[in-house]
């Protein structure tokens, strides 16, 4: 139970979701602009992954070495440069992250109606004075889910007094993991404040 609560309160908190998806949109914009031929300032390691389509098959020792060099500095240094760039969308997304002025995130139990998303897209396009296509960087929806306990993937092991390691389900007859094994899905809507 604590695991599920931790995920919802920390990793799947609305602020965390908002920051993560603004960053995802920002990186998509960086990739889009780079593929259009625009030269954006960024570290060598980040540039490699932005300019190339890396798959499981193409992930070689060179890609691994560059991947190992990536850290938050690559992103932060990019954000600090891109916030002053001439692409308005990239600059705005960078400023949002740096200034911690993120999107509003609303969570729902069922998928968000397309009409609601379209209405918010129109409003954002008007407010920001940009085409609806670009407003989709600031208004979007999706789903998140959490399964607190998956015995087949990430079982919890208990070290007993008898020096044995057993699964938590066998360690206690008190543990009803059916409830924890249930996947909980929520739908999010990110939009301007």
Listing of model-derived features with the role each one plays in the protein:
Residues 1-193:
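Histidine-centered, transition-metal-coordinating active-site segments
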